[in-house]
Amino acid sequence: MATDGASCEPDLSRAPEDAAGAAAEAAKKEFDVDTLSKSELRMLLSVMEGELEARDLVIEALRARRREVFIQERYGRFNLNDPFLALQRDYEAGAGDKEKKPVCTNPLSILEAVMAHCKKMQERMSAQLAAAESRQKKLEMEKLQLQALEQEHKKLAARLEEERGKNKQVVLMLVKECKQLSGKVIEEAQKLEDIMAKLEEEKKKTNELEEELSTEKRRSTEMEAQMEKQLSEFDTEREQLRAKLNREEAHTTDLKEEIDKMKKMIEQLKRGSDSKPSLSLPRKTKDRCLVSISVGTEGTVTRSVACQTDLVTESADHMKKLPLTMPVKPSTGSPLVSANAKGSVCTSATMARPGIDRQPSHGDLIGASVPAFPPPSANRIEENGPSTGSTPDPTSSTPPLPSNAAPPTTQTPGIAPQNSQAPPIHSLHSPCANASLHPGLNPRIQAARFRFQGNANDPDQNGNTTQSPPSRDVSPTSRDNLVAKQLARNTVTQALSRFTSPQAGAPSRPGAPPTGDVGTHPPVGRTSLKTHGVARVDRGNPPPIPPKKPGLSQTPSPPHPQLKVIIDSSRASNTAAKVDNKTVASPPSSLPQGNRVINEENLPKSSSPQLPPKPSIDLTVAPAGCAVSALATSQVGAWPAATPGLNQPACSDSSLVIPTTIAFCSSINPVSASSCRPGASDSLLVTASGWSPSLTPLLMSGGPAPLAGRPTLLQQAAAQGNVTLLSMLLNEEGLDINYSCEDGHSALYSAAKNGHTDCVRLLLSAEAQVNAADKNGFTPLCAAAAQGHFECVELLIAYDANINHAADGGQTPLYLACKNGNKECIKLLLEAGTNRSVKTTDGWTPVHAAVDTGNVDSLKLLMYHRILARGNSFNEEGSESSVFDLDGGEESPEGISKPVVPADLINHANREGWTAAHIAASKGFKNCLEILCRHGGLEPERRDKCNRTVHDVATDDCKHLLENLNALKIPLRISVGEIEPSNYGSDDLECENTICALNIRKQTSWDDFSKAVSQALINHFQAISSDGWWSLEDVTCNNTTDSNIGLSARSIRSITLGNVPWSVGQSFTQSPWDFMRKNKAEHITVLLSGPQEGCLSSVTYASMIPLQMMQNYLRLVEQYHNVIFHGPEGSLQDYIVHQLALCLKHRQMTAGFSCEIVRAEVDAGFSKEQLLDLFISSACLIPVKQSPSKKKIIIILENLEKSSLSELLRDFLAPLENRSTESPCTFQKGNGMSECYYFHENCFLMGTIAKACLQGSDLLVQQHFRWVQLRWDGEPMQGLLQRFLRRKVVNKFKGQAPSPCDPVCKIVDWALSVWRQLNSCLARLGTPEALLGPKYFLSCPVVPGHAQVTVKWMSKLWNGVIAPRVQEAILSRASVKRQPGFGQTTAKRHPSQGQQAVVKAALSILLNKAVLHGCPLPRAELDQHTADFRGGSFPLSIVSSYNSCNKKKGESGAWRKVNTSPRRKSGRFSLPTWNKPDLSTEGMKNKTISQLNCNRNASLSKQKSLENDLSLTLNLDQRLSLGSDDEADLVKELQSMCSSKSESDISKIADSRDDIRMFDSSGNNRVLSATINNLRMPVSQKEVSPLSSHQTTECSNSKSKTELGVSRVKSFLPVPRSKVTQCSQNTKRSSSSSNTRQIEINNNSKEENWNLHKNEHLEKPNK
């Protein structure tokens, strides 16, 4: 083994050396690899791979033999028999590693060296090979690019040559145009110079006019000041005359007492001399009636001296005999109607004034002799009267009339031509007797209606007429003109009834057509023309032109006559019905044509001339509406110049006149073969078309072609749009126009596919099959819709093409139009009523198709375009604008209108489970996805077949959109800045109010945001100042920018977005959505302009006083310098004055003057000397020697009612009125020194008085000041509380106004009605001292869901404020006579028992009638709170039921005016202005009967115990009657208030007999029962009139001595019917003044005072 190992070692060591040597030699040579070819590189690569494989084999063999060789080499030479060698071996084994020496060379190291070298070579070779391959690829790519560039270079060179040629032509054309334009520029420059010269002249004229206008303004201001001064003088003179009148009346009263004494003496003498019985009760009644007539018709002095024995029977009988029906000159507006016709029937002519009647004229559409009654189903109600419907059979359409009304009269033919207006539906009948007031009317219309309606001479329900002489006549001839006046009143009443009477039938939307015209005429297409019941003509325009007259066409006439064809009547009618499916933008000039067409539709034959049948070709199919030569129309692709849209031929009498759309144009009508002459077609065609004979052979190719080739020629002509050839082919006999080629395309399909509208029209007129499908199932409509030829689509739809036809794949025309994004075609198909939910075989809907193409407009049309009702006129532009302006300046209609597609269609999934949202999100169509997300029914979490949602497949942008679907809702608040402290009456005014929440989307622009803020403010201002409960959505239709209180977007001072200031119209770099999120703006605050800016907008919003009135107050202060504000306590006088002072101060400071406000509170101890010191210290009073300063002083004197005005201001009146050094006044100071002073011109003096009116000596001050009266029943106080509480509710609901049925609205309305009813009752009781302003009710709590809180607050207000004031006023009235000099007199410190009972009765009545009445709480719950009210436990049996939830609209006109002497002038508080005539005869009947029975029962109550609470009150009346007349009058008034119904609800009560309490009396009450029966007769509403108080007081009649057990004389004479009606006329004639000063006392107060004086002084002698 050793020898073998030794022999093998050199061989093993030599092999690696040889390999290393070979590698070294190869390395030395190092041939260049880059120079090798591809084949050599491949060979080298194969050699290398072989060597690598051999190397691997060698390595494996060497590894296998390594161990064996190693062992043999190390241990092979040792033998066990040699110990020396063993020792040597052990020695080597025991030595260290460093000391060991290898016995032989290690082959492993040699092998590793070889392997390392081979690896290096392998890596180098692979790198070189990769570099070679990359270079080879680059080379090939560069070769290909070079070839492509060479080809492109050749193409570009060719194009360059072409473009050079074109550019040369363009340059030549531009040069010509430049020359032309330069000439035009010179002409325009000359024109401009002329215009500028004219403009300069106009400017000069304008400046002159402005100067004249300013001078006129100054003159008017001066004249106004003079007029105001004269008015103040007149007021003073009037007050003096009134005082004189009162003195005269007192003297008259004394004279009447003497007359009464003389009467009694005469009666005693008669009884002593004659034994005849006294006058019977009926005789007294008659005398009583005559007295009333004398009082009403004669003057003041005559009335004072009149007695009961004056006889004026002749005049009364004469008036009764006057005929009621008088001939009146007939007019076109109001023909005569029989005055004695029952039921108040109006003629068919509109009896209204031109200023009121805004109804369009329809007289030419309705026959003159046919009564125009609305059909029962025609329930259209418009604002001022509905349009007249069609004219069906009158016997079947006459509405049911009232039982007491005769059938309406028919308009005679003689009157018909005079009437240019059709009768409105609800002007045919006057309101019946029990018709109540329309709840939503203007108060002016209501007042005017009752002004002319409630007459005593009007016929009642039974047709009877009662007459009495007028109460007061202005002229001597008024008696003769009575009936004429009555007729005029009836006319105005009937005109007003159009606005006030309730409508018959349920109201429908104004745009709905009447349903009674179905079947009469086929509806015309939507060309802004309605049928007989819908056509409208504006007032003032001539009526529509009647049919069969020349000059009807709106299009120009052709230059030569055209050939016409007879239209088949059946096709005409069918086509007319088909036209209804589209909307057309029709100009107003098409109205007369539309009327003509409607009247001619049902004619059996056309009126066009009949020509030979063969050349029956009408080439007027060109859109221009005139004849086009055959040469112009025969060229392929030649489109003549046309206006947008399709126009009707000018002379076509047999077709619809639709200016912008051809509904049907029968220009070709195939004729039978028997009526054609062979061989005549060519020549006649040439003659008709205008060709020259030389062109005919070219077209006909030498003669007629065989029919076998004609269908192919027909296809070519239709596909190429050759109208002339197509018309020739269609006129040949035996030609199959429905022939289809190999692919199934017919001629109509080819024409529709290529958009040749004229060819389509020709083929359809030739009765080509409109629904013929090709081999794939596509019809011509499908082809036209897919290609976007909307005119062809319109024609095909008009010819009854199947709009829902589905091809073999399920594609409908709508699907194809959406797939190709053809907006106009989609719109036409939708208006035709196509089905949007048809699915294809793949489950795709049109919504999928629209979204797949990313067409936003198509998707919007599908989702939001509504299908209009047939026959209803609609403005196409309006509907289109409501669809497409989605992301424009205005808010998108998606925010205000709902999509028309259901949620199922939006969420429908196709075969893969993808919805439209999946497709939009996956393709990144963000706009389409956003539109889909606006649909409320979208399900974004719906998953497809792969369990993926829309968010899973969405792109990044769409994911962001889906993550931010919800828009930001930022509350918008209005701030009025700092409000002054509560001592100015502003403690209940709120600083900030939330009006709404703005929805800010990510796509919202700053312009949209500005418009949204402005619109929200305008809507809020309009909502809080409206008459009813509005929501912000209800106000959007209102286009007015100013509200009733005068606030608008111009009232804004600044706006802050969170804490960042912003102004309307300002834009930031970020969008509003990003801006709000980045700045974390939680609210938007709008600050209104206030006194600091010299404006009053914030004051208006804080106090709800209209801005115009505040500005008027400020103008009065600036103009007159001396202004006093007076009104009931709590009318915000102090707040108004202080805000006006602040505004005036800042205005003066802006003008450069220094200004100071000096405020002084006046109390009972405030003396004239203190006021003098105040004027001097504030530099208002300046010594004559001292020069005036430029400083402005504003002095405010508060609570002037606590002092005597005449004593406090007497010495200052003259110098205040004449402020100059020329009229000084000497004043004595406290130190005894006197000095001359005068008032500074720059001094403003304002005062406040918490008193409703001036009395006594205070009237002397009136003419020296400008007075502003804040009446509780007039603006601004009347609507202030309503607006304030409504704003409070809106703020509580965070800008969302609740519905009127909400409990919060009801409780707020109740609080408002409490204030109004309370003041009306207090005014009726004659206690103006107790009247309350709205300030106390501003703190009304608004707590949703807790109405009890408001009731508890009301109880605290009643106990703390209202009841003490009422008690003080009642005691001051029921105690001693009040002194005329000083406001309120103090009541007795220790009132008597009777006075206490009167106070309790008054509080109980006020509580039940004014406070608890109308409370929305349930009866059981309200009874629990009644005990909290002071005075609620006083027993009264006759009180108004307070469980009614009806809102009180106003109070009665029958106010109690109880002033019996000149010292009490409370009559001015007795006329509330919102709804005076709201009391019916029932109220009079209840009052009269109750008082008659009450007084009779009072005389019997001494022997009986108190049976009920009423008798208790009557005993109080009897007990108090022995003490004071005021107490007696007060108790009578309380009885009247108890016995009457609620004033607001009396007019709605038909008969309240059960509410009348009848008491047993003696047997001599026959006249009483007769009167009761007389009063219970049915009375029409025209007789319902406000009662003056003297009717009530006259009803408290006196008894005779034999019937009374007491010493006072009272009469039991009832008031006759004629007396009542006469009194109602007196009341109706009276009117309140509109002067801004104090409203004059009603004229009835004089007569009323006379009655009370008479009744009072009749009783004095018997005391």
Curated annotation (Swiss-Prot):
Residues 384-396, 1624-1638 have a biased composition (Low complexity). Transmembrane segments: none annotated. Residues 1645-1663 have a biased composition (Basic and acidic residues). Residues 411-422, 583-593, 1582-1599 have a biased composition (Polar residues). Disulfide bonds: none annotated. Residues 1-23, 203-222, 352-440, 454-478, 498-616, 876-897, 1446-1485, 1580-1602, 1615-1663 are annotated as: Disordered. The modification Phosphoserine is found at residue 1524. It comes from the Eukaryota. The modification Asymmetric dimethylarginine is found at residue 498. Interacts with CTTN/cortactin SH3 domain. Interacts with STRN, STRN4/zinedin and MOB4/phocein; this interactions mediate the association with the STRIPAK core complex and may regulate dendritic spine distribution of the STRIPAK complex in hippocampal neurons. Activation of glutamate receptors weakens the interaction with STRN and STRN4. Regulates the dendritic spine distribution of CTTN/cortactin in hippocampal neurons, and thus controls dendritic spinogenesis and dendritic spine maintenance. Associates with the striatin-interacting phosphatase and kinase (STRIPAK) core complex to regulate dendritic spine distribution of the STRIPAK complex in hippocampal neurons. PANTHER family: CTTNBP2 N-TERMINAL-LIKE PROTEIN, FILAMIN/GPBP-INTERACTING PROTEIN. This is Cortactin-binding protein 2. It comes from Nomascus leucogenys (Northern white-cheeked gibbon). The lineage of its organism: Eukaryota, Metazoa, Chordata, Craniata, Vertebrata.
